[in-house]
Amino acid sequence: MSSRAVMTIEPTAATLAATRGWLAPVRSALGAEFLAAYLHGSVLTQGFDERRSRVNLLIVSRSLNLDILDAVRSVLPEDRKAPHISPLFLTQRQIEKSLDVFPIEWIDIKERHLLIEGQDVLGGYEVPRSNLRLQLEQELREKLITLRQAYLANARHPQVLEDVLKASASSFATLCRSLLRLRGESPPAQTAQVIERVAD
């Protein structure tokens, strides 16, 4: 049964089917430890291109000890055809302990996720916003420094610069959504509208 967040745009049936197909052996390996699997990130935005972008998949487990990790590793699909699944494995305790450390990421996931398997374990969490401004400023400064260094190193190589910008686009979109939240605004689901709102 699927659960949809307010900001979510439904992924294509093909993407959902491919993700569930990837997840099936992983869920089987986790057995009773498996709790939930969520799509999150750009796959739930308008204009997502599965040929180029990765499908972010959060998998929540009761435990992730070494035996469990070995069981999961042995069944991880090796098919490199699109869509490309990017899994993040966490326990409930790890989520609880990281909410205040990574407010940007968790607020974004809380507002833009789709439960595709298991029970909803994210619904009861509240993300503290006390560190949001600090993390946002730190990451924006880091991104700007990285882009400046890339420009200086590759000014004569426009294709390299284009690749750097493309690789940075998704993370900048996440930061822009966080900037809107810091201003007390609700970010739209469409990335283009997010950028327009930040530019106003």
Language-model region placement:
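Conserved nucleotidyltransferase catalytic core and NTase-mimicking acidic/glycine-rich helix/loop elements
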Residues: 126, 131-200
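Extended, charge-rich low-complexity interaction segments
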Residues: 119-127
